[in-house]
Regions:
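A residue-level detector for the "anchor" residue at the start of short, highly conserved motifs
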Residues: 2-179
């Protein structure tokens, strides 16, 4: 009868939706996130590392850099707690992104310094060459830095400002100097 066939079709459709949903869920559960590597630099040390894309990173003491074993997808993203200098290998199709608690820095091929120690009142990004896009405030505010500019964020006042520091002071730690 027509009613019996209609019930059979409804049951078949419900089973198809259920099986499809379970299959999609299981496929997503089995998808592996890229393996993350951690570079922790103890007190009174610095370390040079080369990321999988060829980007050179000099990491300051008491800093941690998290990065994937292999960059995949549309961007090359790392997470920094502390301070590091990045000499980014150019790749216009895959922007290089450094994330910290306070802001995100996007570069295509440039050299810049990020200082984002959680215990410090200020975090900053200083541009040595090229250009970078710095975003903050849940990525709703942004500015593009030019060479020899530094964006500084005061965590207590939640204020950002762009200054023109002495770059020798900004990079003194890379030469083992204290400022």
């Amino acid at each position: 009868s027509l009613r019996t066939r209609l019930v059979v079709w409804r049951v078949a459709a419900a089973l198809l939706i259920t099986v499809s949903s379970i299959s999609i869920y299981l496929a997503l559960q089995n998808r592996q996130a890229p393996d993350l590597l951690q570079a922790y630099i103890p007190t009174a040390e610095t370390r040079n590392i080369t990321l999988p894309d060829g980007t050179q990173v000099l990491i300051n003491s008491q800093s941690t850099l998290l990065y994937p074993q292999q960059f995949t997808g549309d961007t090359r993203c790392v997470y920094l707690v502390g301070e590091a200098n990045f000499k980014v290998k150019p790749d216009k199709k895959h922007p290089f992104i450094v994330k910290s608690d306070d802001f995100q820095v996007t570069a295509l091929g440039t050299e810049f310094n990020v200082s984002a120690y959680p215990e410090n009142q200020e975090s900053s990004t200083a541009l040595l060459s090229g250009s970078v896009l710095v975003e903050w405030g849940n990525l709703t505010q942004r500015t593009v830095l030019q060479p020899d500019e530094q964006l500084t964020y005061d965590k207590e006042n939640r204020q950002f400002r762009v200054v023109h520091p002495d770059m020798a002071d900004v990079t003194a730690w890379q030469r083992g100097e204290l400022v």
